[in-house]
């Protein structure tokens, strides 16, 4: 119903949604961010990509693995970008960046959420291994994206083949 209100008001407005995959919403959304593990099939994602619709993956208070919790293995933050790349998504949505609890330097819990779920950096711009690993994954993603773009322009079939293996 809400989508119809938006479409009836202005057909040019873009509609986005973050949540579990619902096939019935697919054609209605310009930008769909799927919860990791609740995503479309690879074939459905390829159709979204071919029609120019944005698709991203996100994690939040779940799933427990992979994630960016204080107790998560740091490599998970980097691995997520490789997963995003492998499945042809446009990017990764981190649901919270700086929602700090009262004393973030002493206690990373925020309400009932897992420790570290609500922030990736500490007050005052202090980084942490979780953020740095996520950043490394983003850099990896961008490097491969740029290499794919350059090899497509060059027509180098061998290089294109190697990049498809990633």
Task: Write out the residue ranges for each language-model feature.
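Catalytic-core regions of glycoside hydrolase
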Residues: 1-103
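Catalytic domains of carbohydrate-active enzymes that cleave complex glycans
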Residues: 1-21, 89, 105-166
